Amino acid sequence: MAKKEMVEFDEAIHGEDLAKFIKEASDHKLKISGYNELIKDIRIRAKDELGVDGKMFNRLLALYHKDNRDVFEAETEEVVELYDTVFSK
């Protein structure tokens, strides 16, 4: 596989394209901000309507979204086992 040649930024040549990339990325950040507000509203509803703490909601959301329950369980179990070993009375 051939190495890709590095491009050196030249404002005169690449400036307009860079501005387009920045504007495109900014548009995506604006959408993300909007979605984050929607998630915040859902988290508040879960707290108000179901009594679920916001921190717990966030942890469950991350666990569900990343679909890594097994990894989380294994890591948590490992930490608890080590804790019990180190701090056993």
UniProtKB/Swiss-Prot annotation:
Quote any Pfam family the record assigns.
Phage_DsbA
What protein name does the entry list? Double-stranded DNA-binding protein
Q: Carries keyword RNA-binding?
A: no
What InterPro entries has UniProt attached to this entry?
Double-stranded_DNA-bd
A GO molecular-function term, please? DNA binding
Q: Does the keyword Aminoacyl-tRNA synthetase apply?
A: no
> What processes in GO biological process is this protein linked to?
DNA replication
Q: Which domain of life is it from?
A: Viruses
